[in-house]
Amino acid sequence: MAGCIPEEKTYRRFLELFLGEFRGPCGGGEPEPEPEPEPEPEPESEPEPEPELVEAEAAEASVEEPGEEAATVAATEEGDQEQDPEPEEEAAVEGEEEEEGAATAAAAPGHSAVPPPPPQLPPLPPLPRPLSERITREEVEGESLDLCLQQLYKYNCPSFLAAALARATSDEVLQSDLSAHYIPKETDGTEGTVEIETVKLARSVFSKLHEICCSWVKDFPLRRRPQLYYETSIHAIKNMRRKMEDKHVCIPDFNMLFNLEDQEEQAYFAVFDGHGGVDAAIYASIHLHVNLVRQEMFPHDPAEALCRAFRVTDERFVQKAARESLRCGTTGVVTFIRGNMLHVAWVGDSQVMLVRKGQAVELMKPHKPDREDEKQRIEALGGCVVWFGAWRVNGSLSVSRAIGDAEHKPYICGDADSASTVLDGTEDYLILACDGFYDTVNPDEAVKVVSDHLKENNGDSSMVAHKLVASARDAGSSDNITVIVVFLRDMNKAVNVSEESDWTENSFQGGQEDGGDDKENHGECKRPWPQHQCSAPADLGYDGRVDSFTDRTSLSPGSQINVLEDPGYLDLTQIEASKPHSAQFLLPVEMFGPGAPKKANLINELMMEKKSVQSSLPEWSGAGEFPTAFNLGSTGEQIYRMQSLSPVCSGLENEQFKSPGNRVSRLSHLRHHYSKKWHRFRFNPKFYSFLSAQEPSHKIGTSLSSLTGSGKRNRIRSSLPWRQNSWKGYSENMRKLRKTHDIPCPDLPWSYKIE
């Protein structure tokens, strides 16, 4: 068809497959009563005269020609076989096993060859059945829409097509004569509400749905292009409760469902938490959005329309509860999005939270008896709020507002509160949930769980609700849990942007304020939010996942350290041949940026003389000094003297400490001493920041990390992946490592003990 939408081919294909499974309104359910009596008169009228004719012909044949008796009997049997299969075929068409069995039994005696019955059709899946047995005329539209959507979503129908089919079917049902479905009034002298039998209504709804699907396959109507939907993640569990009393609603194409052509794009999401039974939650999930559209102020004031829809839904369910002796209620929270406006309405303790730029934003305050304004309202009506495991209204319910609960009116009312906010594009997502979630997970924890899940799965949000439900259950929730996460923007792009920029913003900016004791800042940041990782339970399939607290990531950002291109480690394989390979000569290893410690600048000011580097390594015995070269700032290379207060080495390279057991204590006494000849004094600074903040490169070759210090202790931190010149030397080094836990370096006159 000219001008058809691109999705028409997909929709037609779905309708063909759907009709193959949904072969009629009575498939898998109760048969229609009308076609039952049609095949009955056919087998009764024809077979009756046949026995008389056969007997007369047989008598005449026996008198005139006795020898032809066998031929007459054979002809009679052939006639019986020609007449008998007719009722069998009719019974098979009807699908009634009892009539088919009776016809087969009637044809079986005296006959050896009976044709096998035709194969039976596979059983059809049962159709959705309404919960209530009777409804009013005002509730027909909601019931019709719900029955259609249930049946279509069971076959994974696209949301746009499901909304269009449900709207067309509901309109056909509302325009039909519903008087045939009325329940007769009771003759008790009282005037009651006109009620409709829901089973008959359901049969009519499915019949109309089947007819519309058949017509749309042949001639698909011209429909507007489906809108872009908000990505959602939904999960609900019964948890440890005996029954599941939560219900949720997700209508991404609100305009199509109610045939609204002059409105902006609209979406509707709701969570209802029932108590005392599931009837109230089901009723609200079916009828509240229908009552919303029927309000006069809906086009220009959706927030007020939501409040009135809650009130109307509460009043009608209270009437229904009186007719059917129901004693239950439900809390509820609804979010309605129209264009760039977010409208929220709620009764009870079901909640919704907004996350903007990674921060939780409070949109509402739940209705609980411990709220001072709610307590005053209840007491003004003559009720009371008492503590009985929790604050309860009249010692019974722990919520102060709800739909239903007729026996607790007016203390527990159905008046909803509302709130509206403008969506400026910085919003991330919404989390709608019942009290089973929010009683154990606070908003900040929920944000952490979502952010961790998104970064672990590269922005895939399909299992976010499952992760939130699992976090509430693991936190101790035993109530029903329902969670809906509505993403207001593409979180995959948000995660990718954060991976590029977040670590730059959070790592080593400004001065060092943690005393330099940031040992954890040695690894690469592989995730944008490394600080808050939540472990997923095993039943969600995250068994192989590593918690980010085991990753070496920064938990306390420090000052910025700009390291040279060959940062912080002495690679002796890259030194010029004219320079000796010893600790007496070290390359410049560190350069502090703008955030350098003040003491480092003070050292540069005090240093006015450079010592020449000797080309040979002297033997040391006892305490001594040797020069080392460091570049602390931009003033150039400085020669410092490192003094050992106790003997630290003896002999030349490849020799070990003579007293290995005392190496740790000896190394702990290393200090920096800086000399200035013309002032004739020594300055002993105490460093409170690390001079190196990078891991060893782990490449083949000898490397030595710079001296490191902390506010509490001084020590040398090293990593020496020694050169593997020969297998014999490598084996010897490994033997020494296993025996003494020392790492021998062939180019240095001492060894380092592993920390």
Swiss-Prot record:
Binding site for Mn(2+) 1: 273-274
Composition-biased stretches (Basic and acidic residues): 518-527
Listed Pro residues bias regions: 114-129
Modified residues (Phosphoserine): 535, 548
The protein's Enzyme Commission number: 3.1.3.16
Extent of Low complexity compositional bias: 102-113
This protein's GO CC annotations: cytoplasm; nucleolus; nucleoplasm; nucleus; protein-containing complex
Free-text remark on how the cofactor is bound: Binds 2 magnesium or manganese ions per subunit.
Major location (coarse): nucleus
Region (11 X 2 AA tandem repeats of P-E): 31-52
Feature: compositional bias, Acidic residues: 31-68, 77-101
InterPro entries named in the record: PP2C, PP2C_BS, PPM-type-like_dom_sf, PPM-type_phosphatase-like_dom
PPM-type phosphatase domain ranges (all copies): 231-488
Intracellular or extracellular location(s): Nucleus; Cytoplasm
Disulphide bonds in the chain: none
Each Sequence repeat, start to end: 31-32, 33-34, 35-36, 37-38, 39-40, 41-42, 43-44, 45-46, 47-48, 49-50, 51-52
Enzyme class, first EC level, given as a word: hydrolase
Reaction catalysis annotation: O-phospho-L-seryl-[protein] + H2O = L-seryl-[protein] + phosphate; O-phospho-L-threonyl-[protein] + H2O = L-threonyl-[protein] + phosphate
An example Gene Ontology biological process: cellular response to lipopolysaccharide
Keyword Cytoplasm annotated: yes
MF GO annotations: metal ion binding; protein serine/threonine phosphatase activity
Name under which the protein is recorded: Protein phosphatase 1E
Protein species of origin: Homo sapiens
